[in-house]
């Protein structure tokens, strides 16, 4: 009777915690469903205010009567052109403003750029027509009354309307250009809410069922992870809605897999320790208290390491990269809080039977001290030097291939793993027209320097045409309007011979800027190619500055947690080695298996954050247990027991996290597929090789000195 009274209070607290979590999720869950509506996927919006492309864009807006900028939708009609077919296509294209967007009463005319006309012109080879439909960049970035983004709806309406007239006149139509490519990008990210999330949950559920061999237990950690994701997603939505952070499709996808993976990892650690403690008591509340005491510190340290590493991204010059920092940190903090509150409450409410059919009994038997992990840890203890030398050499061999990794940026057409209509259209456009046709690089110049700048840049690499912006459209058979002058400034439109969003076009920008600045020191070079070049420059700067800051932060956290400088340096060194080994494998696979054209400049940074921060996670889980056991039985015996008792749960956690990130490969986008592969492979490498063999072998080799300067160095 006394035990019943004693247990009633913690049971009531557990019920209260669960009720509170249902209230929290009820508030934030519906907001998570709206997260896609606040996405921003336009590269130009991510640049810092001081970037030249941004400064140019600000001045280019002054040349419009409204606060807008042109965002062209290019429609390529491939086929033999005759006066009759040209007239038919031209007539139809000029009427697209009357098209109504699906599911709304809005017309395309509401989203056309003011002061710019729709135009159609033939290619020099007579085998294609190109329609330029200038959209209002600000208007298409908003939402329709049905809360759907404008741009994909406009692109879809153009495709549906122009296909019949094109085919009737012997043409194959392709909606491409910036609007078509970004519209297809929206479509790819649109799968995040459904396909990515459901697949991630399904994969994690299967792994948990295999790990626990229980038809019931797997539901509890997965439910906790869902509560964490809904809450984190709702918080992120509110921040993005109020323009505090930027959310793009990539950061939303990463948030989903990061929260589910991290929350499940923390849950595996807590449940494993809880099951272990249930073998030593009949009272589940006593067992949970002991388990909680053993895991709260490593979970808090692990989550804090990842969260702080992500927050370092706030130092990025790009707002989308900087936005990923707090987005990921919110996900990790909410995951920790959920697993340290909701999960214990659920486990206590359901009792021991939740482990059925393998219900732990109070038999005083330390079951985890037998089995394959006991054999592995004892084998390493028998010859640690051989173990760390062999694993070190293998990792160094993989790391040597990291120098062949291609991560110097990719164009939008190479961003897709498949071939959507916009990509096919852009490739064909480059066959019949200059690659930059319809989407020029723009130079803002002083009005009295138009001739000088034109002469300076007309023979620059990649430039096929230089024309000033005119004050209005040229009437049929009439004289051309005057050059448009605003506040003593004019705009030169440069047509490049390459796709404007390609790496090659971006490579032409520095020379164009050098020549333009020499002719007019006040000139500003902007446009799509300049934006991509400035984004690439900012990414390279981030790689050089943010990675060292993260390394310093992680070293300090490890030093405080383990009370040892040497152990912090050793652990960090092993994870960095694992990171470069992973990059080496990525280089081999991306170049020779998947055949990717390249990778984003941000790939090394994102891979570093997730691989190093998450890799340190598993070392924290291991070494906090090793430290706990070393205080009781000595360092070498402690590391043997630590590997034995944590081996299964940490490996399971690694498999879960690897599987969740691997799901990113389902999205038809190269950057996410690359990041998913890198994190999945890197996490498995870290859990199976680094944490299981290399770290224990090094600790055995170094001995008690690993704990310097703490008192444990004598154990």
Question: What is each stretch, according to the model?
Answer:
Residues 73-74, 390-393, 441:
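Short coil/turn segments at secondary-structure boundaries
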Residues 36-37, 71-72, 77:
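Short, conserved active-site loops that position catalytic residues or coordinate cofactors/metal ions
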Residues 49-70, 80-179, 407-598, 620:
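Structured non-transmembrane domains adjacent to transmembrane bundles in polytopic membrane proteins
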Residues 43:
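N-terminal entry motif of extracellular EGF-like repeats
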Residues 71, 250, 391, 468-469:
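Short loop/turn and capping residues at structural boundaries
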